[in-house]
Amino acid sequence: MEAIAKHRFAGISPQKARLVADQVRGKSVDQALEILTFSNKKAAVLVKKVLESAIANAEHNEGADIDDLNVAKIFVDEGPIMKRIMPRAKGRADRILKRSSHITIVVADR
């Protein structure tokens, strides 16, 4: 039994979000929530929200017992990139890349 939750177009770069995703991969949901709660990273807040949604999906849609769930899969894909311009000296301009992410979490029974 598996339950999936996604956060598409999350406003954080995939590189930063993957640092947090790697910390909770394969852990039980209780342990993962504890790790995310005490993490100081912005991505931890986003990943925690998706994990809580996946747990709720498992409980509501599949009738799963929360105590038996673990993070089976978690991955962060690259979303669209907004390109912005920052003016520089002597009429030049630099390109700013505002990256976004698609965060996907699959929880399953142990």
Curated annotation (Swiss-Prot):
PROSITE patterns: RIBOSOMAL_L22. GO terms for biological process: translation. It comes from the Bacteria. It holds the Pfam family Ribosomal_L22. One of its GO terms (cellular component) is cytosolic large ribosomal subunit. InterPro entries: Ribosomal_uL22, Ribosomal_uL22_bac/chlpt-type, Ribosomal_uL22_bac/org-type, Ribosomal_uL22_CS, Ribosomal_uL22_sf. The keyword Ribosomal protein applies. Keywords: Ribonucleoprotein, Ribosomal protein, RNA-binding, rRNA-binding. GO terms for molecular function: rRNA binding; structural constituent of ribosome. Belongs to the universal ribosomal protein uL22 family. This protein binds specifically to 23S rRNA; its binding is stimulated by other ribosomal proteins, e.g. L4, L17, and L20. It is important during the early stages of 50S assembly. It makes multiple contacts with different domains of the 23S rRNA in the assembled 50S subunit and ribosome. The globular domain of the protein is located near the polypeptide exit tunnel on the outside of the subunit, while an extended beta-hairpin is found that lines the wall of the exit tunnel in the center of the 70S ribosome. Part of the 50S ribosomal subunit. This is Large ribosomal subunit protein uL22. The gene is rplV.
